Regions:
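Conserved small/polar residues in nucleotide/adenosyl-binding loops
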Residues: 304-306
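Histidine-centered catalytic micro-motifs used for acid/base chemistry in nuclease
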Residues: 293-296
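Extended, structured, electrostatic nucleic-acid-contact surfaces
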Residues: 283-289
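Flexible loop/turn segments at secondary-structure boundaries
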Residues: 32-36, 47, 63, 282, ...
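Glycine-rich phosphate-binding loops of NTPases
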Residues: 1-12
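A cross-family structural signal marking well-folded subdomains
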Residues: 20, 24, 29, 45, ...
């Protein structure tokens, strides 16, 4: 093996020394009446690095003195196998931010603990874990759109995933959950996701890509909750006030005057041009994976271009 940044391989003696001198092992023995999950939680105060997900898992299982094994096997383990540790933490934050747009990802454990403090019995705790699993399956589809069954929704999810921003995650998960509960169908979901995609693209072309984007989309998530037609509600919300959802006329003007080559992120500019190219439906599509933007022409518009 090689040490980080080292070109020479480590010797067996160096590996042995690192393990013997640098590795600490903690052994905890529990009795019949001990709560292993409570003991695990307390380890966070002894210098061991526990994630927000670790703490939340153990908080939940502390509330399951008689059903922990069944809930772990049937609900938590499938969730844990579905998502990585980082994805799990994000899921728990996405769940919290639906109700509190200001909650930070460092506050996941405390926030979820407050949210669940009124749970009365093990059946209610089990229901929470079951709900997390349902949300986890939706989040998994968001991250891996190829798993989505509906073609139109799959296409829109893939577009948002290609944009590579987490700012759309809260509202997308909310919309996905609304469909899973039967509040909206796949056509309505696809339409809402199209508005979301259009909002991202229009802001970039109009030159206002980063201005308050995260705050706006978190507020939109709260605004459309409970509304019968979340797609129309989303469009109304994004089109109101100073949210920079550029109109068609504004986009036409921006295309002629805005410095596209220097607007937003390079990856997003390339993506927009790629989507335009793909919209023509060429019988011989060009492989654009390795393409780069060298020039945006013409640099000066004349009447012939307009």
């Amino acid at each position: 093996p090689y040490a980080d940044g080292e070109e020479e391989p480590l010797t067996l003696a160096e590996v042995e020394s690192a393990v013997v001198a640098g590795l600490s092992i903690v052994s905890v023995t529990t009795g019949e009446n001990d709560n292993a999950h409570r003991i695990f939680e307390s380890l966070n105060n002894t210098g061991l690095k526990l994630t927000q997900g670790d703490l939340l898992r153990n908080y939940l299982f502390m509330q399951l003195p008689t059903r922990a094994d069944e809930v772990y096997t049937t609900l938590w383990l499938p969730l844990q196998n579905l998502l990585s540790n980082e994805e799990l933490e994000t899921l728990f934050w996405l769940d919290l931010v639906q109700q509190d747009p200001k909650v930070r990802q460092t506050e996941i454990y405390a926030g979820q603990q407050r949210r669940m403090r009124d749970l009365q019995d093990e059946s209610q705790v089990r229901a929470e874990v079951e709900r997390f699993l349902a949300l986890g399956r939706l989040y998994d589809v968001m991250l891996r759109p190829e798993k989505e069954k509906d073609a139109a929704v799959r296409f829109r999810l893939a577009r948002l995933r290609a944009w590579r921003t987490t700012t759309t995650f809260p509202i997308t998960l909310h919309l996905m959950e609304r469909r899973s509960l039967g509040d909206i169908d796949s056509d309505e979901l696809a339409r809402a996701l199209l508005y979301l995609e259009s909002y991202l693209v229009r802001r970039l072309v109009f030159g206002r890509y980063s201005d308050g984007l995260n705050t706006t989309l978190l507020a939109a998530t709260a605004d459309i909750q409970g509304q019968d037609d979340p797609a129309d509600a989303l469009q109304r919300f994004l089109s109101s006030g100073r949210k920079h959802f550029a109109s068609d006329d504004q986009i036409r003007q921006a295309v002629m005057t805005a410095p596209f080559y220097t607007t937003g992120r390079a990856a997003h500019r390339k993506l927009i041009l790629r989507w335009i190219e793909e919209s023509y439906g060429s019988k011989e599509p060009v492989d654009l994976d390795s393409a780069t933007i060298e020039h945006v022409m013409p640099q000066t518009l004349s009447l012939i271009h307009i």
